[in-house]
UniProtKB/Swiss-Prot annotation:
Involved in the acrylate pathway for the conversion of D-lactic acid to propionic acid. Catalyzes the reversible dehydration of Lactoyl-CoA and 2-hydroxybutyroyl-CoA to acryloyl-CoA and crotonyl-CoA, respectively. It comes from Anaerotignum propionicum (Clostridium propionicum). It comes from the Bacteria. This is Lactoyl-CoA dehydratase subunit beta. The keyword 4Fe-4S applies. The keyword 4Fe-4S applies. Keywords: 4Fe-4S, Flavoprotein, FMN, Iron, Iron-sulfur, Lyase, Metal-binding. It is an enzyme of class 4 (lyase).
Length: 374
């Protein structure tokens, strides 16, 4: 096994076994983990407290039963899966769970949490251009920090926060480099492997993830770039799961050369910048800089233009919209984006994503037909 294969295998194992990753961290440090609900949270606070931030993004292919009691049928599958798992006690080992509430279903779920872990809820301001929005979010972060300190029994110092911010900024920068390398080496980093590298960072200390990805990049770049005889796409949406869906991309030689997925590249899009103000203020300012996301209000609707630019920069053949079933914010963005794609002559395909689905024949047929048309 080559070193590239070994690193990818390690990251895939972490991505597929989050509970083991959490248990290993507990055994190593004596501290626990804090759940991080979609989409954005001040993970740096959890890291600064010495606890492991654990992403909570549902499950793949799990049958929903108990969750139907608490959520309507038109709640997205990520929230349905999370509700199902927490009804089964899957998250009870977490020391706390942090909720941001940018959509109606997240608001609902934060109030219906059935697990034993304490829930910490905060709100991102949506009128993001105002300085008042920054001050509001600082106040929200101060409340999150105070609740974390109370629940975890620790003190989160500014020095610890600054250190965590630097670690997270480095991880985001390394992952942005990984995106470019993966685009150049689709024979090495296929759709499944690319997703695993992103997903593993949800269940690892960022400094350890950074070290592995740095080594992975160096090993890959030591080999020559080979011509790609398949198609290249940019993917946008909340997430691209289950893995059976990614297998279809591999089957038809569809390389993901860039993405705008909430679970993946949106997490690394914006750094916490240096400057005046304390760490909480600068973390709040990062939200003001966020762009191209359906959960971050943008009256100018720049997401479509951003995606078109990505296709130009990467030489992609098309855009694939991975539409999360019953996700209102994503559905509201799609008509605007689609019109812009058509006006610019950019080919696109919309596929419906549902974590509960077990049959992929329809998506397989649509992707096959789309590839043949490109």
């Amino acid at each position: 096994m080559s070193r590239v294969e070994a690193i990818l295998s390690q990251l895939k194992d972490v991505a597929a076994n989050p509970k083991k990753a959490m248990d290993d961290y507990k055994a190593e440090t004596g501290k626990g983990a804090v759940g991080i609900m979609p989409i954005y949270s001040p993970e740096e606070m959890v890291h600064a407290a010495g606890y492991l931030p654990m992403g909570i993004w549902g499950a793949q292919g799990k049958t929903i039963s108990k969750a139907r009691t608490y959520l309507p049928a038109f709640a997205c599958s990520v929230m349905q899966q999370v509700m199902e798992l927490q009804c089964e006690g899957a998250y009870d080992d977490l020391s706390a769970v942090i909720f941001s509430v940018p959509c109606d279903t997240l608001k609902c779920l934060s109030q219906k949490w059935k697990g034993t872990s304490p829930v910490i809820v905060f709100t991102h301001p949506q009128n993001r251009g105002l300085e008042a929005a920054n001050q509001f979010l600082v106040t929200e972060y101060e409340l999150v920090k105070a609740q974390l300190e109370s629940v975890l029994g620790v003190k989160i110092s500014n020095a610890a926060l600054e250190n965590s911010i630097a670690i997270y900024n480095e991880n985001r920068a390394v992952m942005r480099e990984f995106v470019k390398v993966a685009a150049d080496y689709p024979q090495v980093i296929d759709a499944v492997s690319r997703h695993a590298v992103f997903k593993a960072r949800q269940f690892m200390l960022k400094e350890k993830h950074t070290a592995l990805v740095k080594e992975l990049i160096a090993e890959i770049k030591a080999t020559p770039v080979q011509p790609w005889d398949g198609k290249k796409v940019v993917v946008t949406g909340i997430l691209l799961e289950p893995n059976e869906l990614l297998d279809i991309f591999n089957e038809f030689k569809i390389a993901i050369v860039d993405d705008d997925l909430a679970q993946e590249s949106r997490q690394i899009r914006v750094d916490v910048l240096d400057g005046e103000g304390g760490p909480l203020y600068r973390m709040a300012k990062a939200w003001q800089q966020m762009y191209g996301c359906s959960l971050a209000t943008d009256t100018k609707k720049g997401r479509g233009r951003m995606l078109i630019n990505k296709t130009i920069q990467t030489g992609a053949d098309a855009i694939v919209v991975a539409m999360m079933k019953f996700c209102d914010p994503e559905e509201w963005d799609y008509p605007v984006m689609y019109r812009e794609f058509e006006e610019k002559g950019v080919k696109s395909l919309m596929i419906e994503v549902d974590q509960e689905v077990s049959s992929f024949e329809q998506i397989k047929t649509r992707l096959q037909s789309f590839v043949e048309m490109l």
